Structure formats: structure tokens, C-alpha cells
Amino acid sequence: MKYIIEHMEEGFSEWVILEYSQILREVGAENLILSSLPESTTEKDIPQRLLKLGLRWTTKDLKGINEDFKDLELLKDGRVCLLDPRATIDLQPEDATKFDYFVFGGILGDHPPRDRTKELKTAYPNLLISRRLGDKQMTTDTAIRTTQLIIKDRIAFEDIKFIDYPEFRFNKNEATEMPFRYVLDKEGKPILPEGMLDLIKKDSAQSLDDLLM
């Protein structure tokens, strides 16, 4: 099971670095590809924290990934799943046998959401098949975590425990509500990337848009 994140933007915010780092730790560097980086991108543009975790990246788009990564199975029409908030069918455990790759357009962590999935579906009408992860916005690491639970662990979406729009309180007068859905851990707490809570606390005076950029 391979995951592809269509980065499609310049630079890496601290938020994105923490998310990608967590994804790499959870799925393994061999199972994650960052694609569609700006053509001018060189290795020095990639954060060292991600390189040390083994991040594999390319400026190629979905159709060109196999040119840079000969070890990967070919991306075949109808065997690539696009996680699309506007899809009509939710991802199910039985989809594990239907898809080789799962593509995330960066749209799941945007607030407000940008319709990047529409761009991808237009660009690759035969390659991609859309599936949904419920009707709430997720961060990219949450979306990949949810996909793993469904596809790898064979847990139905409706059986996964989530929390929507959790509030993180730092003191009596200071709290931040996150406008996303998160998976809950065994203790009933939302799963965040390592260091994310500190970042939210540090930047709680900023707007969420500033934090994500």
C-alpha cells in the first residue's frame, strides 16, 4: 500500500513538516511519495528533518512518478484511489484489493478547503477513482491514518473513533479550536503529529490560516 501526496506548492511550513514527519514515521518512507513539487525544487529545498526520515520526492506528476522511482509498481488506470471529500462512496475495507495507490491532494488539511481534487480528477480522468473519508475535513496525516485503519487494519469507517473540532486549552483564558476531524487514541485523545500541540500553543495568537501557511 503506497501513499502519494500531491504537494503542488512551494515551500514547507512548520505545520506541513510536522504532518509529513508523522506520516513517514507511521507508514514508512518506502510507502510515501511526495509528488508534483515545483520544477525548480532541489534537495536543498527539502527540510532536513524530512530527508533524515527518508522522504522520497519528485517534481514529476502522477503520470511521471515511475520515471523517478523504478522500484514502484506502475500506476494503472482504475487502480489509484483519490481521497475526495466530494466523492459519493466512502472508503471501505474491501477496497484494499481494488487499489495499489492512495492519492491525497493536500486538500484534506486546508481550511477553508481548496478544490484540488477537481483539478486532479480533470487531469487524470481514467487513472483515478474517488473515495471519501466521511463528510468532515481532516488534516493530511489524519486522512492517511484513517486510510491505513480502513485498508491495512480492515476497520470499517463507521467503527473508527473520531473527534470533530477539538478544543485545546492551554490555560484558563487561552484555547484553540481546530476545525478538523481527528482519530482518537486508546485514551480518547485526538492523535496529533509530534510537536503539533506545542506549535498550536506557540502560535495560538495567530490566525489558523497563518499557522497553516
UniProtKB/Swiss-Prot annotation:
GO terms for molecular function: protein-arginine omega-N monomethyltransferase activity. The keyword ATP-binding does not apply. Its EC number is 2.1.1.-. GO terms for biological process: methylation. GO terms for cellular component: cytoplasm. It holds the Pfam family SFM1-like. It is found in: Cytoplasm. The modification Phosphoserine is found at residues 204, 207. The keyword Coiled coil does not apply. InterPro entries: SFM1-like (IPR007364). Keywords: Cytoplasm, Methyltransferase, Phosphoprotein, S-adenosyl-L-methionine, Transferase. Belongs to the class IV-like SAM-binding methyltransferase superfamily. Protein arginine N-methyltransferase SFM1 family. Present with 2520 molecules/cell in log phase SD medium. S-adenosyl-L-methionine-dependent protein-arginine N-methyltransferase that monomethylates ribosomal protein S3 (RPS3) at 'Arg-146'. This is Protein arginine N-methyltransferase SFM1. It comes from Saccharomyces cerevisiae (strain ATCC 204508 / S288c) (Baker's yeast). The lineage of its organism: Eukaryota, Fungi, Dikarya, Ascomycota, Saccharomycotina. The gene is SFM1.
